[in-house]
UniProtKB/Swiss-Prot annotation:
Residues 499-565 form the FHA domain. GO terms for biological process: anterograde axonal transport; anterograde synaptic vesicle transport; axo-dendritic transport; axonal transport; filopodium assembly; larval locomotory behavior; negative regulation of synaptic assembly at neuromuscular junction; neuromuscular junction development. The modification Phosphoserine is found at S1416. Monomer. Interacts with Arl8. Its main location: cytoplasm. The keyword Translocase does not apply. GO terms for molecular function: ATP binding; ATP hydrolysis activity; GTP-dependent protein binding; microtubule binding; plus-end-directed microtubule motor activity. Disruption phenotype: Flies prevent nerve endings from transforming to synaptic boutons: growth cones become constricted but remain within contact fields as thin processes that lack varicosities or boutons. Mutant embryos die at late stage, they are paralyzed and lacked the coordinated muscle peristalsis required for hatching. It comes from Drosophila melanogaster (Fruit fly). Required for presynaptic maturation, has a role in axonal transport of dense-core vesicles carrying synaptic vesicle precursors, components required for the morphological transformation of axonal growth cones to mature boutons. InterPro entries: FHA_dom, Kinesin-like, Kinesin-like_KIF1-typ, Kinesin_assoc, Kinesin_motor_CS, Kinesin_motor_dom, Kinesin_motor_dom_sf, P-loop_NTPase. It holds the Pfam family Kinesin. The lineage of its organism: Eukaryota, Metazoa, Ecdysozoa, Arthropoda, Hexapoda. GO terms for cellular component: axon; axon cytoplasm; axon terminus; cytoplasm; dendrite; kinesin complex; microtubule; microtubule associated complex. This is Kinesin-like protein unc-104.
Length: 1670
C-alpha cells in the first residue's frame, strides 16, 4: 500500500492579474506551501494557512533561484511513475485546479523546446527505454486511447466513427471501462505525438461547433503498456500489463467566479458535478484511511455519482500508483479558489492505494470470458432463442423465436443479449493479434483523415498525415479559440476559384463544412482570383470582418479576423500578399503601416472579441442614446403626472386641516363657557399676555420651586436619545452593508456627543444643535445638549470622523447611487470615475495630518495675588481617558525678567478683553446649585460636607475655596482697571504620551478667543518615554478690564495637544487601544434583562406603561411551586435545585407525563392599599432551551392559558403578613412542544415564562406577575434529587416548603386619572426599533448590530469621568494656591480614622441605589445662616403637623378627626424623608427623631422583651378613600454580591420573642432565612426605605449589648449580633455611612480628654448586660 503523492505548482501572473495589480499570496519553503488571506489583518491566527505536500514547485518567477521548470516536475513525478509502469503497476497522474491555473501546461506543455509537458515527456521516455531494453526474450507493445468527458458524456477523440456518446460499463475483472472506445497500437513516439495532435483537432472541431472550451471538459489520455517475457527454461511466456492514465481535469472554479449564466451555468453545474463527486470521493477515502483498521462497517465511496470518478475508481484508492498535481494561482483575487484547491490536495494526501503487479491477466480473463459466454448461450437457449455460431468468435447472430419470446420476460432477454455482445467484444479485443491491431489503427487513421478532408481541414500533399504547418503559397484560414491549447489547430485552404462554406446538410456539397448555431446551410463563398480573396456573404448570413458586420462582398487582407456565426473565429492569411507588402516596405523604406501591424502583432481570440465589441460599440451607443431619450421623456411625463396628483392631494389635506381647525376652535369656545371668565375678556390674542388677570401670583418660594422643577426636567434627555438611536438604526445597517459589499473598509456606528470643555462639538455638528441659552433669572446654568451622531471609522486611511444623522442620510443616498452604478457596470466596460458620478466618494472625508491627543485646562486665579504656580495637569481625550500629563508655569511679569532656555522659544502677544467676554459658554462645575447636586448624588454631597465640617473640624471645608476669592475681592495694584498687565505662560514638558504619536506640539488659547491661539514647535516623540521638552515662553499683555478680572477668577486657559501617528495607515486610530477605566456597576444596565409579560389571549396587547405620579411602593415576595401528582393522589411540590451563587434562581426537577399544577403564593406587609381580589388569568409560553427570550414567541401556538382554581387569603400562625395563594392546572402536552414532551437531554435546560394577571381592589388594570422558570424533565419513574452534593447531603429537598422558588417584586401604585391625559400620551410615544429590521446584505455584517441603550450608559460614564477630572483639576489648583499663599495653617494632619470615613463615604456614593446624572448642573450650597434652626416640638405640635400633612396629601378621613391618638405615619410620599441614606447621616437629625423611636415601642407587658425596650413598630395606616390606581409589578433582579451573611438574633414587632435567623445582606435588600440550610427567602427588608439606628441611648434603654434596630415603613426589627466585634461589620454591610459616622465619632472621642473612651463604653454595656441578666 502507498499513499497518493501530491504536488503543488504555482504559476506566474497572467495578463489579467497584472492589469489588476494583484499581489502574490503564495509562499513556498521546501515541501511547505503557505497561503495568506488578504481579507484578514496580518499577524493574526487566521491570516496564514500552511500545508505540507510531497512536492511544492515554485514556478512564479523564472528569475528566482528556486524556479521549477517542466523537466524538474517530470523528474520528480514522471520518471517515478514510468518506473512503476515498467514494474507492472497501474499508474495515474491527474492535474487539478481552477481554469487558467496551469493544468494543461503542466500535462501537455507547448511545442517549444524545454516546454513539453508530462504527457509528451513520459511518452518520449517510454519509447526510449523500450528501445534500450527490448530483446528477443522481452517484447513490448503500446496502445493508446484518448477520450473526453463533457457534461457526463464520453466522447472518443481518435475514431471519427464514434460520433455518439460512448457507454460506460463495468466488468468483474476489468472494472469500469468505456465500451467501443478506440485503442490504437503505436510503435514509436511520433505515432503518439500524431495521435495527440489529431485528438486535439477533433476536440477543437467539436468544441467550436458546440461553443465549448477545454476548460469545461475532462481529457483522459490512457497508455496500455504490455511486457511479454519468454522464459527459455520453462518455455513459458508471462505478461505484465500496465495502464498509464494521464488526466487533465476541468477548471474547479466556483460558478460565481466565472460569471456563467443560462446554458453555460448548467454546463458548469454538470462539470462541477464531476469535480464535486471527485471531492466527495477524496474526502471519503481520506476518512477511511484515517479510521482504525478494525472497523467492521464498510464505508460508502460515491464512485458511481459521476462518469469521471467511476472510470478513475481504480486510480483512487484502488489498484494504482497515483500522483496528483494541484495547479494554483498566486494572485490574491483568486484566494477562495486557491484555498479550495489546497484543501482538496491536503485531503488527497491521506488516500491509500493498494497497487499490485498485473501479471498474466489475459489468459485468466479469456478463460473466464469463455465460460461466461457459454452460460449466456445456455440461458438464451432456455429462453427459446437460437444462437448461430460461426468459426470466428467475433461474430454471432441471435435469432429470436417469436412464439416463445411472447411468453418470456422481454427485459431479461435483452439484458442477456446485451451482456453477450459486450463479452464477445472483449474476447475479440483480447484475442486480436498485434498485427491486426496495427492494421486496425491504420484503417482508423485513414478514416480520420478522410473525415477531416471532407470537413475542409487541410492535409499535406501526400494525403497521409494531418499536421499544422504554414503553407507557402495558398491562402488559408486558421482557427482561433478561447482556449490557447485549441487555437491554430485547424487549417482550411482557400483554393483557386470558388470555395463554398456551409453545413453538411446543404444541397450543393460544401468545401468547408462547419456546424453549430447561426451557421446557414450555404453561409458564404470565398473567391480566389490571382491571389486576391474576396468574401461573398449569402443572405441572412452572420459574418464579421475585423469587427465590422459584412453585408456586401469584401476583399480580405492578410491578417484579417473573420467571425462566422457566433462561435467560429478565424484568422485569414495570404502568403503572397504578405510577401509583397514586406518587399514593398523594404524597397521603399516606408514607415510601418496598419496592415503590417495587424500581421505582426499577436492576434488571438481575445483580440478578435475585443475588436468586435469596440467596432460594434458605435451602434450600441446610438441605441443607448435613443433609449435614454425615451426614458427621459417618460420620466418627464410621469413627473408631471405626479406633480398634478401631489397638488390635488395638498389641496385635499389643506381642506381637511381647515375643517379640523374650525372644529377645535368650536370646542374651545364651548369649553370656555364653563370658565369663570367671560369670553369677552380675551377676544384678542395679545390679551393673554397683557390682561392683569393672567399675571402670575406666585410667591418667591413658589417661583423658585417651579424653576427648580423646570431645570430638573430640562436635563432628562434619555428618551429622545433612545428615539434617535432606534429610529436611525436601519440607515446605519444599510450604510455598513453597502460598505462591506463595495469593499470600502469603512464602518459606521452610533456615538453620543455632548458639548463640554473636554469634548466641544465640531462646527458642522454644533450648527445642528439649538443655541445654548445663558442662565435664566433663577440662576440656572446653560444646558449642555447631548446629540446622537455617527462615528465613521475609516480603516483604509486610519481616520475617524463624526457625522450628523442628517449627513448620514444624505451620504446614504449617494452610497445607494454608487451601489447601483457598481451593479450595473459590465465586466468588460472601462473603469468609471467615482468623482464624475457622485462628485466624490460618499464613504470618505478629508482628514488632517495631526490628530488631537487631548485637552488640558489651567486656572489663572493665582494672577490675582500675584504668585507664580507650576501645574501638572492631565491630558484628557474626548472620552474622559487620561493620555498623558503637561507641566505648565503661569506667573505674572511685574518687571523685566530674563528667561533663558537652551532650546526654548520666547514670544509676546497682546490681547483685549471686551465686556461680552465676561459670559463664557461654559461654566465651572463648582457653580452648580444644591438642588441639582442632590439630583446627581442622591442627597449625599450636602450631608458629606456636613459630616466633614462637624466630625473632622479641619481639612478643606465648604469655605476653603472661597477664602481665596474673599481676599481677592479688591484686586491689587497690578490689576487696576485701565492699566496694562503682563503675565507669562510657559509650556515646560509633556509626559506619558503614547509612543504611537510623533511630532507632538501644544496649542493654547482663552475659551472665548479660539481664533487667537498660541502654538509651540513640534517635538519628536521617542519610544523611550522620556519627557518632551517644549520650553515655550509666551508673554501676554492685556489691558485690565472687569471682564478680564472676572475671567481670572472663574475661567481657565485651554491647552490642546496634537500629534500624528508613527505608521500609516492609522488603522488603530478608531480602536483607542489603551487601558480605559471601567465604569462602576451602577452605571451599567442590567446584565440579564427582565422578561416582558406573556401576552394574554383574554386581555390582548399590553397597554403602555403609565407615567403618572407614584402614590405608593410596596415590596412583594412571591413563591413559585410546580406540584406533581403523587401516588397518594395529592399534589406534591417537585424538587427544586437552588443556586448558591445567584439569588432567587433555581431549577425545577420534573417527571415526564405527570399531571402538574402551578402554585403561586404572594407575601407582603399588611396594608389597606393592596388587597387581592381574584386571579384572572395565568399564561405560560416562550418554551425554549436558552435563557434569552423574544416577544416574537408570543405569536407561537405554544402560549397556553391555564385553568384556574379560586385564590384564597391565608393566615399563617405567628406571622401577621398578608398571604394570597392561587393554583392553576398545567397540562404541558397542550403546548405541543418537544422540549416539554420528551425527557431532557444531557446538559439541557428548558425555560418557560409565565405571567399571572391578578385583580386588585381600587385598581383599573390587572397586576401582572412575570417570572422565568427553568426546569429539567426526567423519566416518569426516575428518582429526582439535587445534582450537587451540598444540597443532596443537606436533605432540605425533602422538606416541601424548601421546594419553591422566590421572586422579589416592587409594586408601584400610580394615579389612574392621569393615564389618558395628553401630556402622558405624548410621553408614551413609541418609536419603532429599526435595529432588527432586515436590510439587504445584512448577512455580510456577521452579526454586527447598531448600538442601543447601552450607549447611553457608556456615555454617562464618560461624562462623569470628565466631570470628576474637571472638579479634581480645579480643586488641585485651589490647594496649590492655598499652599503657595500660606493659608493652610492647620498643623494637624488628617488622621487614619478620618481617611476611613472618607473611604466609606466614597464607597457609599458608588452604591447601586443612587444614579448619577453628571451632565446636570449644580449651584453652591446654601448659606448655613439661612438654614432654619432645629427645635423640639411638643406632643400637640407634632399631632397638628401630622394632621396638616395628611390634609395636604388628601389622606385624612373623618374617623381620624375625632381620634386624639397621634400616629406617626411614614406615607409613601415621605419616602424621601425615610431614605436611609438621608436620615441616618446627621447625628443632629437622629437626636431630633428620638421621640419617633420612643413612640414606636410595643406594649410593656411583653415577658420575653428586654427590660424597658419594645421592638420598634410602624404607625398604622389610615383608611384610604376609594380611589383608582394603576398597578405596576416589576421583578427586581437581586444582586449576586453578598455584603454580609451570618446568624443574628432577631426580635420583630408582633413576634413571640427572640429568634435566631440566618441573614444575608444583598444591597439594597436584606434576606432572612430560617436557618443556614434553608434555601428559601422567608422575608425581605428594603434598605432603601428603612431607618437604621445604633446609638448609646438605645443601648442604654434596651440594656442588651451588640444591638441595633432596622425600622421599615411597616414594622421594626431589633437585631443582635453574636459577638461584639461583629456589630461594626454588620452596620457597614447594611449602612456604610452610619458605620463610618460611628467609627469617626469614637475616634474623635479618643482625642478629647473629657470624652469617654471605647473601653468605658464597653464596660458600661457590660454592666447593663449584667443588670439585665440579674
Amino acid at each position: 500500500m502507498s499513499s497518493v503523492k501530491v504536488a503543488v505548482r504555482v504559476r506566474p501572473f497572467n495578463s489579467r492579474e497584472i492589469a489588476r495589480e494583484s499581489k502574490c499570496i503564495i509562499e513556498m519553503a521546501g515541501a511547505t506551501t503557505a497561503i495568506t488571506n488578504p481579507k484578514v489583518p496580518p499577524n493574526t491566527s487566521d491570516s496564514v494557512k500552511r500545508f505540507n505536500f510531497d512536492y511544492s514547485y515554485w514556478s512564479h518567477d523564472h528569475h528566482d533561484a528556486d524556479f521549477s521548470t517542466q523537466s524538474m516536475v517530470y523528474k520528480d513525478i514522471g520518471e517515478e511513475m514510468l518506473q512503476h509502469s515498467f514494474d507492472g503497476y497501474n499508474v495515474c497522474i491527474f492535474a487539478y485546479g481552477q481554469t487558467g491555473a496551469g493544468k494543461s501546461y503542466t500535462m501537455m506543455g507547448r511545442q517549444e523546446e524545454q516546454q513539453e509537458g508530462i504527457i509528451p515527456m513520459i511518452c518520449k521516455d517510454l519509447f526510449t527505454r523500450i528501445q534500450d531494453t527490448e530483446t528477443d526474450d522481452l517484447k513490448y507493445s503500446v496502445e493508446v486511447s484518448y477520450m473526453e468527458i463533457y457534461c457526463e458524456r464520453v466522447r472518443d477523440l481518435l475514431n471519427p466513427k464514434n460520433k455518439g456518446n460512448l457507454r460506460v460499463r463495468e466488468h468483474p475483472l476489468l472494472g469500469p471501462y468505456v465500451e467501443d472506445l478506440s485503442k490504437l497500437a503505436v510503435t514509436d513516439y511520433q505515432d503518439i505525438h500524431d495521435l495527440i495532435d489529431e485528438g486535439n483537432k477533433a476536440r477543437t472541431v467539436a468544441a467550436t461547433n458546440m461553443n465549448e472550451t477545454s476548460s469545461r471538459s475532462h481529457a483522459v489520455f490512457t497508455i496500455f503498456f504490455t511486457q511479454r517475457r519468454h522464459d527459455l527454461m520453462t518455455n513459458l511466456t508471462t505478461e505484465k500489463v500496465s495502464k498509464i492514465s494521464l488526466v487533465d481535469l476541468a477548471g474547479s472554479e466556483r460558478a460565481d467566479s466565472t460569471g456563467a449564466k443560462g446554458t453555460r451555468l448548467k454546463e458548469g453545474a454538470n462539470i462541477n458535478k464531476s469535480l464535486t463527486t471527485l471531492g466527495k470521493v477524496i474526502s471519503a477515502l481520506a476518512e477511511v484511511a484515517s479510521k482504525k483498521k478494525n472497523t467492521k462497517k464498510a464505508d460508502f465511496i460515491p464512485y458511481r455519482d459521476s462518469a469521471l470518478t467511476w472510470l478513475l475508481r481504480e486510480n483512487l484508492g484502488g489498484n494504482s500508483k497515483t500522483a496528483m498535481i494541484a495547479a494554483i494561482s498566486p494572485a490574491d483575487i483568486n484566494y477562495d479558489e486557491t484555498l479550495s484547491t489546497l484543501r482538496y490536495a491536503d485531503r488527497a494526501k491521506q488516500i491509500v492505494c493498494k497497487a499490485v503487479v498485473n501479471e498474466d491477466a489475459n489468459a485468466k480473463l479469456i478463460r473466464e470470458l469463455k465460460e461466461e459466454i457459454q452460460k449466456l448461450r445456455d440461458l438464451l437457449k432456455a429462453e427459446g432463442i437460437e444462437v448461430q455460431e460461426e468459426d470466428e468468435l467475433t461474430k454471432s447472430t441471435v435469432i429470436k423465436s417469436p412464439t416463445k419470446s411472447r411468453n418470456r420476460n422481454g427485459s431479461t432477454t435483452e439484458m442477456a443479449v446485451d451482456q453477450l455482445q459486450a463479452s464477445e467484444k472483449l474476447i475479440a479485443e483480447l484475442n486480436e493479434t498485434w498485427e491486426e491491431k496495427l492494421k486496425r489503427t491504420e484503417e482508423i487513421r485513414v478514416q480520420r483523415e478522410a473525415v477531416f478532408a471532407e470537413m475542409g481541414v487541410a492535409v499535406k500533399e501526400d494525403g497521409i498525415t494531418v499536421g499544422v504547418f504554414s503553407p507557402k503559397k495558398t491562402p488559408h484560414l486558421v482557427n482561433l479559440n478561447e482556449d490557447p491549447n485549441l487555437s491554430e489547430c485547424l487549417l482550411y485552404y482557400i483554393k483557386e476559384g470558388l470555395t463554398r462554406l456551409g453545413t453538411h446538410e446543404a444541397n450543393v456539397p460544401q468545401d468547408i463544412q462547419l456546424s453549430g448555431s447561426h451557421i446557414l446551410k450555404e453561409h458564404c463563398t470565398f473567391e480566389n482570383k490571382n491571389s486576391t480573396v474576396t468574401l461573398l456573404p449569402h443572405k441572412d448570413a452572420i459574418i464579421y470582418v475585423n469587427g465590422r458586420k459584412l453585408v456586401e462582398p469584401e476583399v480580405l487582407k492578410t491578417g484579417s479576423r473573420v467571425i462566422l456565426g457566433k462561435n467560429h473565429v478565424f484568422r485569414f492569411t495570404n502568403p503572397e500578399q504578405a510577401r509583397e507588402l514586406r518587399d514593398k516596405i523594404e524597397t521603399e523604406n516606408e514607415a510601418e503601416n496598419e496592415v503590417e501591424k495587424t500581421d505582426t502583432q499577436q492576434v488571438d481570440w481575445n483580440f478578435a472579441q475585443c475588436e468586435l465589441l469596440e467596432k460594434q460599440g458605435i451602434d450600441l451607443k446610438a441605441e443607448m442614446k435613443k433609449r435614454l431619450d425615451n426614458l427621459e421623456e417618460q420620466y418627464k411625463r410621469e413627473k408631471l403626472q405626479a406633480d398634478q396628483q401631489f397638488e390635488e392631494q395638498r389641496k385635499t389635506y389643506e381642506a381637511r386641516i381647515d375643517a379640523l381647525q374650525k372644529q377645535v376652535e368650536e370646542q374651545s369656545m364651548t369649553m370656555s363657557m364653563y370658565s369663570s371668565y367671560s369670553p369677552e375678556d380675551f377676544h384678542q390674542e395679545e390679551d393673554v399676555y397683557t390682561n392683569p388677570m393672567y399675571e402670575s401670583c406666585w410667591t418667591a418660594r413658589e417661583a423658585g420651586l417651579a424653576a427648580w422643577a423646570f431645570r430638573k426636567w430640562r436635563y432628562h434627555q434619555f428618551t429622545s436619545l433612545r428615539d434617535d438611536l432606534w429610529g436611525n438604526a436601519i440607515f446605519l445597517k444599510e450604510a455598513n452593508a453597502i460598505s462591506v459589499e463595495l469593499k470600502k473598509k469603512v464602518q459606521f456606528q452610533f456615538t453620543l456627543l455632548t458639548d463640554t470643555l473636554y469634548s466641544p462639538l465640531p462646527p458642522e455638528l454644533a450648527s445642528t444643535v439649538a443655541p445654548v441659552h445663558q442662565e435664566d433669572e433663577f440662576g440656572a446654568p446653560p444646558v449642555s445638549k447631548t446629540l446622537v451622531a455617527v462615528e465613521v471609522t475609516d480603516t483604509k486611511n486610519g481616520a475617524t470622523h463624526h457625522w450628523s444623522l442628517e449627513k448620514l442620510r444624505q451620504r446614504l443616498e449617494l452610497m445607494r447611487e454608487m451601489y447601483h452604478n457598481e451593479a450595473e457596470m459590465s465586466p468588460t466596460s472601462p473603469d468609471y470615475n467615482v468623482e464624475s458620478l457622485t462628485g466624490g466618494d460618499p464613504f470618505y472625508d478629508r482628514f488632517p495630518w495631526f490628530r488631537m491627543v487631548g485637552r488640558s485646562f489651567i486656572y489663572l486665579s493665582n494672577l490675582l495675588y500675584p504668585v507664580p504656580l507650576v501645574h501638572k495637569v492631565a491630558i484628557v481625550n474626548e472620552r474622559g481617558d487620561v493620555r498623558g500629563y503637561l507641566r505648565i508655569a503661569v506667573q505674572p511679569v511685574l518687571d523685566e525678567e530674563s528667561i533663558d532656555f537652551n532650546n526654548g522659544v520666547k514670544q509676546s502677544a497682546r490681547l483685549v478683553f471686551n465686556e461680552d467676554d465676561a459670559k463664557p459658554k461654559y461654566r465651572a462645575l463648582n457653580e452648580k446649585d444644591d438642588v441639582q447636586r442632590y439630583i446627581d448624588n442622591g442627597g449625599l454631597d450636602s450631608k458629606l460636607e456636613e459630616l466633614e465640617d462637624v466630625d473632622s473640624g479641619r481639612g478643606i471645608d465648604s469655605n476653603s475655596a472661597s477664602e481665596c476669592h474673599e481676599n481677592s475681592e479688591e484686586p491689587g495694584e497690578h490689576l487696576q482697571v485701565g492699566k496694562e498687565f503682563t503675565f507669562r505662560v510657559t509650556v515646560l514638558q509633556a509626559t506619558g504620551i503614547g509612543a504611537e504619536y510623533a511630532d507632538i506640539f501644544c496649542q493654547f488659547n482663552f475659551l472665548h478667543r479660539h481664533e487667537e491661539a498660541f502654538s509651540t514647535e513640534p517635538v519628536k516623540n521617542s519610544a523611550s518615554g522620556a519627557p518632551l521638552g517644549f520650553y515655550h515662553v509666551q508673554n501676554i499683555t492685556v489691558p485690565v478690564t472687569k471682564s478680564f478680572i472676572e475671567y481670572l477668577k472663574t475661567q481657565p486657559i485651554m491647552f490642546k495637544i496634537f500629534g500624528h501617528y508613527q505608521t500609516h495607515p492609522l488603522h488603530k486610530d478608531a480602536k483607542q487601544d489603551f487601558v480605559s477605566r471601567p465604569p462602576p456597576r451602577r452605571m451599567l444596565p442590567p446584565s440579564i434583562p427582565i422578561s416582558q409579560p406573556v401576552r394574554s389571549p383574554k386581555f390582548g396587547p399590553l397597554p403602555c406603561a403609565p407615567t403618572s405620579t407614584v402614590l405608593a411602593k410596596h415590596d412583594v415576595l412571591v413563591w413559585f411551586e410546580i406540584c406533581e401528582l403523587a401516588p397518594n393522589g395529592e399534589y406534591v411540590p417537585s424538587v427544586v435545585e437552588h443556586s448558591d451563587d445567584l439569588p432567587c434562581r433555581g431549577l425545577f426537577l420534573l417527571h415526564q407525563g405527570i399531571q402538574r399544577r402551578i402554585r403561586i403564593t404572594i407575601v407582603h406587609e399588611p396594608t389597606t392599599e393592596v388587597k387581592w381580589k381574584d386571579i384572572n388569568e395565568l399564561v405560560v409560553g416562550r418554551i425554549r432551551n436558552t435563557p434569552e427570550s423574544s416577544d416574537e414567541q408570543d405569536e407561537d401556538a405554544c402560549v397556553l392559558s391555564l385553568g384556574l382554581f379560586p385564590g384564597e387569603a391565608l393566615e399563617v400562625p405567628g406571622d401577621d403578613r398578608s398571604f394570597y395563594r392561587f393554583e392553576a392546572a398545567w397540562d404541558s402536552s397542550l403546548h405541543n412542544s418537544a422540549l416539554l414532551n420528551r425527557v431532557s437531554q444531557g446538559g439541557e435546560t428548558i425555560y418557560i415564562t409565565l405571567s399571572a394577571y391578578l385583580e386588585l381592589e381600587n385598581c383599573a388594570r390587572p397586576a401582572i406577575i412575570t417570572k422565568d422558570l427553568s426546569m429539567v424533565i426526567y423519566g416518569r419513574d426516575a428518582r429526582t434529587g439535587p445534582r450537587s452534593l451540598k444540597h443532596l447531603f443537606s436533605g432540605q429537598y425533602r422538606n416541601p416548603e424548601a421546594n419553591r422558588l422566590t421572586g422579589v417584586y416592587e409594586l408601584a401604585l400610580r394615579r389612574a386619572s392621569e393615564a389618558g391625559s395628553p401630556g402622558v400620551q405624548r410621553r408614551q410615544r413609541r418609536v419603532l426599533d429599526t435595529s432588527s429590521t432586515y436590510v439587504r446584505g445584512e448577512e455580510n455584517l456577521h452579526g454586527w448590530r447598531p448600538r442601543g441603550d447601552s450607549l447611553i450608559f457608556d456615555h454617562q460614564w464618560e461624562l462623569e469621568k470628565l466631570t470628576r477630572l474637571e472638579e479634581v483639576g480645579r480643586m488641585r489648583h485651589l490647594l496649590l494656591l492655598r499652599e503657595r499663599l500660606g493659608m493652610d495653617t492647620n498643623p494637624n494632619p488628617t488622621t487614619k480614622t478620618e481617611k476611613d470615613v472618607c473611604n466609606l463615604a466614597a464607597r457609599a456614593a458608588t452604591s447601586p441605589v443612587h444614579m448619577v446624572i453628571p451632565q446636570s448642573p449644580q449651584t453652591p450650597v446654601k448659606d448655613p445662616q439661612q438654614i432654619i434652626p432645629e427645635r423640639e416640638y411638643n406632643q400637640r405640635e407634632q399631632d397638628l403637623m401630622l394632621k396638616c400633612l395628611k390634609l395636604v396629601q388628601g389622606r385624612y378621613t373623618k374617623s381620624e378627626a375625632n381620634d386624639t391618638q397621634t400616629q406617626s405615619d411614614v406615607s409613601p410620599s415621605d419616602e424621601g424623608c425615610a431614605d436611609m441614606t438621608v436620615s441616618c447621616i446627621s447625628s443632629n437629625s437622629m437626636e431630633n427623631n428620638k421621640f419617633v423611636i420612643r413612640r414606636r415601642l410595643c406594649s410593656p407587658d411583653r415577658a420575653d422583651a428586654p427590660n424597658g425596650w419594645e421592638a420598634p413598630a410602624p404607625a398604622t395606616q389610615p383608611a384610604l378613600p376609594l380611589r383608582l390606581y394603576v398597578p405596576e409589578l416589576e421583578e427586581i433582579r437581586v444582586s449576586p454580591v453578598v455584603a454580609r451573611k451570618g446568624l443574628l438574633n432577631v426580635l420583630e414587632h408582633g413576634g413571640s420573642g427572640w429568634k435566631k435567623r440566618w441573614v444575608i445582606v444583598r444591597r439594597p435588600y436584606v434576606f432572612i432565612y430560617r436557618s443556614e440550610k434553608d434555601p428559601v427567602e422567608r422575608a425581605v427588608l428594603n434598605l432603601a426605605t428603612a431607618h437604621v439606628e445604633c446609638s448609646e441611648d438605645q443601648a442604654a434603654m434596651v440594656k442588651i449589648p451588640n444591638t441595633f434596630s432596622v425600622v421599615t415603613k411597616h414594622r421594626g426589627y431589633l437585631l443582635q449580633t453574636l459577638g461584639d466585634k461583629e456589630v461594626h461589620d454588620w452596620l457597614y454591610a447594611i449602612n456604610p455611612l452610619l458605620a463610618g459616622q460611628i467609627k469617626s465619632r469614637l475616634a474623635r472621642r479618643t482625642l478629647e480628654p473629657a470624652s469617654q473612651t471605647a473601653s468605658q463604653i464597653q464596660a458600661t454595656n457590660a454592666a447593663n448586660a449584667n443588670s439585665a441578666s440579674k
